[in-house]
Amino acid sequence: MLDMTERQVESVLIEIPKGSRNKYEYDKEKKVIKFDRMLFSSMVYPCDYGFFPDTLALDGDPLDALVLTWEPTFPGCVIDVHPVALLDMKDDKGRDEKILCVPETDPLWNYIETLEQVPPHLLKEIVHFFETYKNLEGKHVIVIGWEGLDAAVDMLREAKSRYLEKNK
């Protein structure tokens, strides 16, 4: 269980800014952010999207992060965040968890500590985006649901351990 007197602050590397239809991905070999594709639908990312460096998720990639921002940042931006919740999902490759975070230095969001403090409609928008954004590609995503702070912290801890184990 996380000690709420000390927030867990982590860094996230942003790949895709809020409001973008462009899908960017970090190329591990070239160490650059590359344009992957334009989303096939007219949907846009509901929040900044990136990953936690030096982690390894169950899908073999770094652990995904969703960062609530008032204004979009940019690909390659690093933001200090604290985790709030876990979005549990499955795609064609299997489990695809994402950690919902808020920027540590943004007074519009940094008061949020738990899933229950996130605007409920925003949570619905995020779920709706991930349930439908790949439909026109003929791919489908199953959103299992939201889990709280403890699940997010546990997933982050496991992803860090998995990364360290793989890179001994």
From Swiss-Prot:
The lineage of its organism: Archaea, Methanobacteriati, Methanobacteriota, Stenosarchaea group, Methanomicrobia. It is found in: Cytoplasm. Homohexamer. PROSITE patterns: PPASE. InterPro entries: Pyrophosphatase, Pyrophosphatase_sf. GO terms for molecular function: inorganic diphosphate phosphatase activity; magnesium ion binding. Its cofactor is Mg(2+). This is Inorganic pyrophosphatase. Transmembrane segments: none annotated. It catalyses: diphosphate + H2O = 2 phosphate + H(+). Keywords: Cytoplasm, Hydrolase, Magnesium, Metal-binding. Its EC number is 3.6.1.1. It comes from the Archaea. CDD domains: pyrophosphatase (cd00412). Mg(2+) 2 binds at D64. GO terms for biological process: phosphate-containing compound metabolic process. Belongs to the PPase family.
